[in-house]
Amino acid sequence: MHLRILGSAAGGRFPQWNCGCANCAGVRGNAGKNTGQHAFPGKARTQAQLALSADGISWFLAGASPDLASQIESTPALHPRARRDSPIAGVVLASADLDHVLGLLLLRELQPLRVYAAPSILRILREENSMFSMLNRADPQVIWTPIKSAAPFPLQDVAGNDLALCYELYPLGGRYPKYVRTKDLPPQDATSALFFTSKSVTSKTSKRIGYLPAVGKLDDALLSKLEGLDVLLLDGTFWSDDELSRLDPTAERAHQMGHISVEESLRLLKNINVRRRIYIHINNTNPILNEAGPEHRAVRDAGWEIAEDNWYLEL
């Protein structure tokens, strides 16, 4: 399986346009300067975005970030192969959060795609937001595909061809975005974990990736789902539960926003059997972005990696 991390920051990217915290001010000060001893020891990041493929030819996106256009341009594997073409076969959605779906509108140029999500997420996009009708100006353009079963589901292109890649939606619950007006949506579908499985034609072995950019808690059932993964990409939004409230007393705590803290997940997953453990969806205030800081060292010493834009993993 081929995995490309196109973006690794939480919503608002890093640096965030209206933030002057120590992290943002530091990385912003690096722009246009030669790296020196006074430079901020960290890297700018675009908003979290994955691309996955079984063969390195046809790709599926996990989410559709607001930075998607520039992320595609910086990734030659996702460039057109003909005058009007895209190797992107479709998109898999974990939620209706703006930083997870706005990039769909950047894919409106009449390119056939398949979009997979829980029925409630598709309902929000198709019935509550007229802008997304721009994705259905031609036939075929976007094929909206609801996933109701928790069983692994084969991903297909718009022609119905299986692409040797399966995925599974694992409901995490939580809350729907504040812009959602519909009140009768099932709470369990607000956020999902995404699990991808690929089988190699030559080795007959399966590879599994788990993508959880927003998870509020790690219960026993979820912990068992994570066991044995080849790659785990986990919610790294906040270092501590009170990260934002220490900066602004009126701000919510991490768990109230549906995010487990890195401090807590490090403890709970200390003995997890996962080949590679990577934190992603990192908020601009998170001290792990400072590569010289104790929090960054604590994560690395625990055997975890901290995702950066443009990483490529081949399993």
Listing of model-derived features with the role each one plays in the protein:
Residues H2, P112-R114, I143, C166, ...:
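Residues at the starts of beta-strands that form the adenosine-phosphate
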Residues D189, S200-R208, V215-Y312:
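Cap/insert and terminal regions of metallo-dependent hydrolase folds
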Residues P15, Q71-E73, L102-L104, R126-E127, ...:
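Short glycine-/acidic-enriched loop or helix-start segments at secondary-structure transitions
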Residues G56-A117:
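Active-site metal-binding motif and surrounding structural segment of the metallo-beta-lactamase
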Residues L107-S133, A138-W144:
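Long, hydrophobic, well-ordered secondary-structure blocks that form the structural core
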Residues M1-A77, R81, P146-K225, W311-L315:
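Core dinuclear metal-dependent hydrolase active-site scaffold
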Residues L61-S65, P87-D99, A117-A118, I209-V215, ...:
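Active-site neighborhood of phospho(di)ester-bond hydrolases with catalytic His/Asp-centered motifs
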Residues R83-S86, L107-Q111, N136-A138, K225-E227, ...:
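Short, conserved loop/helix-junction motifs that constitute active-site signature segments
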